[in-house]
């Protein structure tokens, strides 16, 4: 079977928070990328998000923080951590930090992640590949020149100047080096 082939500046494996944010930042600077995501679509699980101050700053720079739906976010200035039974262990008070990021932002499941993925699709149409599995790196001598993958079960070869492994703690990209 002939292997499909594409060329891009950056190939990113993993469309979680790190990979998707990187791809969006690159797209906003005119850098072409392809993001391979093993899942068949955006995350749907019940996974709430807490945006820490630095994460809020990143979303703000991407132009997304103020676009999160108001009904799906809440600012929290203080967290109390307690033992089972109620004894307080410690308190984290975000109001001691400088504004405007002197809070944590708690969201309904996947709100921030979906906002990032939606913005990425608009900024880089066709650059986010679901049902795409990394199968190996491509080398020219000792230099990485891209990757091999399957997309919807079909083999594909990606040539790129840079490959980023944003595929988590058990990274297949890292294992391939």
Give residue ranges: language-model regions.
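A conserved short coil-to-beta-strand element within the FAD-binding core of flavoproteins
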Residues: 130-144
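Glycine-rich FAD pyrophosphate-binding loop
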Residues: 27-47
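Flavin (primarily FAD) binding-site architecture
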Residues: 165-177
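Active-site-adjacent segment of FAD-dependent monooxygenases/related oxidoreductases
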Residues: 52-119
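Core beta-strand elements of the Rossmann-like FAD/NAD(P) dinucleotide-binding domain
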Residues: 6-8, 153-162
């Amino acid at each position: 079977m002939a292997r499909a082939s594409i060329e891009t500046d950056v190939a990113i494996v993993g469309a979680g928070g790190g990979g998707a944010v990187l791809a969006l930042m690159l797209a906003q600077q005119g850098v072409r990328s392809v993001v391979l995501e093993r899942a068949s679509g955006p995350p749907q699980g019940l996974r709430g998000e807490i945006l820490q101050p630095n994460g809020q700053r990143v979303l703000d720079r991407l132009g997304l923080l103020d676009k999160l739906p108001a009904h799906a976010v809440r600012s929290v200035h203080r967290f109390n951590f307690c033992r089972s039974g109620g004894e307080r262990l410690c308190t984290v008070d975000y109001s001691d930090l400088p504004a405007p990021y002197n809070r944590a932002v708690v969201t309904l499941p996947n709100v921030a992640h979906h906002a990032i993925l939606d913005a990425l699709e608009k900024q880089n149409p066709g650059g986010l590949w679901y049902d795409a599995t990394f199968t190996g790196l491509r080398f020219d001598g000792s230099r990485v020149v891209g990757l091999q993958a399957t997309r919807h079960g079909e083999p594909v070869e990606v040539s790129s100047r840079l490959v980023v492994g944003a595929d988590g703690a058990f990274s297949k990209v890292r294992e391939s080096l």
